[in-house]
């Protein structure tokens, strides 16, 4: 009788029970390579997927010799899919909520720069959401959409220049996860990525120019922005929509009862459309 699992195991982790003849896997020896699963013609060995490994689009997560999962930083693109997929909460992001609230409580000038997609996050008008941010203690609110207008203008000029040079297309530089993907996994795409800064990049500089000594807090939906902020000296903290929503609830702020706040400079609708599919390209047109 063929024993494919036994013959193909590189670590000799498969053995047979002398009484029953059933195959057993020694998990102290097994390295979870999957060779036995692939070689068994009877499908007697079942692969149990690990949610975080399955969710990772770049295969950056794997187990070590002790069966412990690790994230390979040289492959990770900080998309957050593993965080959402893990049913045990074993993967978590490092929050800066308490740092932000501590600075506000200490009387420091803290400026909020919310992403355009905040428009669809709350069941309230944008002025009411900004009013809630003011009630939390933010000294001012500057829309990232204002920075998006600069991104749109600069990317449009850059695209025209590259087309004139013979380049057929150009991709956006707005998404930090995409930038990590290109740098780590598709280096051949690097020449086609725009060198224009993201909306957060420009908005943070607008905030720092207006409030040189202030702490600038980017508020958005994406945890990859935390990585981008680490490389940007003008962004001090990053909060997700989930975190800002928790603060609003924790402080018992009713969005329908706050004093609406209107930003000093309103952004064009195209700048708010960056969050939609095709929004960046549409703005450039």
Regions found by a protein language model. Give the residues of each.
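Iron-sulfur cluster-binding cysteine motifs and their immediate structural context
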Residues: 2-27, 35-77, 81-96
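Iron-sulfur-associated redox domains of electron-transfer enzymes in respiratory
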Residues: 87, 92-285
